[in-house]
């Protein structure tokens, strides 16, 4: 097995130790971004749209440095990185309403022809040098507004790493990460089945919880961790008692739901297989005359390593839309928790861990019965 290109911290006191990201954290992020954009997307596919309601892949290569440069320019009062016309085409992507694609918020103009890859990479290089210069001058830590812009840029790039990865999963041409060997999915499935436990309901008591950040978002400070608009203001809310499952809905549980209800559509993360165990490219399902076992054998799950037979992914959390997951949760006797309910679950689990370090409940709860 090859070691990952970098190791990202999992605890807040580690990955958010200071309100301003370190230059080392930037280098780690840039190496990961470069791996995904330059080694997992073939150059000839940069103009492709794996998700039709999104921009082409090349947009994101220009959007990340351009949007960040705009925020640094606002924060520092400096000059834009050239070419400045990138601001016109890379500031904001398209994000139409899924149910009515005609409803689209304002977005950057889409050019008849995107800039060349070399132009975009040169702009990215200049932007990264601008970031390095800010740290070298001490401005990153001495100027509060600049520090906030740096954190905004870090989170924005991380979020779009996720955007690109779920876009690549919808493509037929994505390349696997070059720094990791393909997992033995059959062995992983066997181990998961051997160690499987029942997905129990847990009682979560009523409690009052805090939601949101105390972040005034002003250049005068005080120095606090950056928060997006939806994370503010801080407030308290009372959450009623409920029962919650101990882990996410799995592919196996979702397969039972689809088979039992005769749903005609599969989640976008699945693929049907043809008789020769190949992908047939049709996102539909029929279960007339099929056994549940045959239904499962005829499906695959999209991964960055290519399709993996569903029978090897039954214990994975299912990736599906809210409506799809909520339908399954209702079939299982519950529903999807609200934001406040999910936060209440996390609060309760954290309290249990502090009282009983040896006892661990699931981190993510898929269904609520209350």
Q: What is the role of each PLM region?
A:
Residues 2-3, 24, 43-102, 137-192, ...:
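Short, contiguous alpha-helical
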Residues 2-46, 50-53, 135:
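N-terminal regions that are enriched for targeting/export leaders
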Residues 199, 206, 210-212, 216, ...:
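Hydrophobic helix-coil surface modules that form long, contiguous segments used
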Residues 151, 161, 167-177, 251-252, ...:
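Short, well-ordered surface patches within globular domains
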Residues 172-209, 215, 220:
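Flexible inter-domain linker/hinge segments
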Residues 116-128, 227-253, 261, 297-353:
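Short aromatic-cysteine micro-motif
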Residues 104-117, 141-142, 310:
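Acidic/His metal-coordination segments adjacent to aromatic residues that form catalytic metal sites
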Residues 82-103, 198, 205-207, 266-278, ...:
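Core domains of carbohydrate- and sulfate-ester-processing enzymes
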